[in-house]
A protein has these predicted regions:
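N-terminal amphipathic/basic-hydrophobic helices that include classical n-h-c signal peptides
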Residues: 1-25
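N-terminal alpha-helical interaction blocks
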Residues: 24-64
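Short Cys/His-rich Zn2+-coordinating modules
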Residues: 56-71, 109-117
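Short metal-coordination and nucleic-acid-contact micro-motifs, chiefly zinc-binding Cys/His arrays
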Residues: 74-78, 124-130
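Short recognition patches in nucleic-acid-associated and regulatory proteins
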Residues: 78-79, 85-121
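Short cysteine-rich clusters marking metal-coordination/redox-active sites
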Residues: 81-84, 131-134
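Short, non-ligating residues that shape and space the ligands of small metal-coordination modules
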Residues: 87-91, 137-143
Length: 165
């Protein structure tokens, strides 16, 4: 990105690094990457267009549980919210897969994903950006991780819900 800026002759004087909503980290087993940037851009254009085809209530419709998860488990994003321009935009990394067993559908940190890539054969990571301030949320990326070795799901461990009903 810096090279593009240098070629065009427009160098940024900002102290912040170049902004990109992507959280694509170069992990050794990352494959089948799907970037939802075009869909995101289309939604934002529909929201900002003079004869709006998308109302703000429809675009900023984050579920209260998603906002709560973003406040407590989100990793700070390097971009501002595209709707309200808040700096509170965070990314959530959801993991899904048969080999994860009862751990499928949980939120994991980026460092945990690197460890999981060595533990599990294959699982899908879905990255969602969420703004707790205005409720904007959008899936920005999905990809597969894992070492490719087929494994059984881990044994189901008893949870608090199992004990107390």
């Amino acid at each position: 990105m810096f090279l593009l800026l240098a070629i065009s002759g427009k160098l940024s004087r900002s102290r912040r690094p170049p902004r990109s909503p992507r959280t694509l980290l170069p992990m050794w087993s990352q494959r089948e990457v799907i970037d939802y940037a075009l869909q995101r851009r289309s939604n934002l254009q529909a929201l900002r267009r003079p004869g709006r085809t998308l109302a703000r209530q429809e675009a900023c419709d984050a579920d209260p549980m998603l906002i709560r998860a973003a406040k407590h488990h989100g990793e700070p994003s390097n971009v501002d919210c595209p709707v309200c321009e808040s700096t509170d935009l965070v990314n959530l990394h959801y993991v899904f897969g048969d080999q994860l067993g009862q751990y499928s559908g949980r939120i994991k940190r980026t460092t945990e994903l690197e460890e999981m890539a060595h533990e599990f054969g294959e699982f899908k990571v879905v990255v969602v950006e969420v703004c707790p301030a205005c409720g904007w949320n959008h899936m920005i990326l999905s990809y597969l991780l894992g070492d490719g070795v087929k494994r059984k799901p881990p044994r189901r461990q008893q949870t608090v819900e199992d004990i107390y009903g």
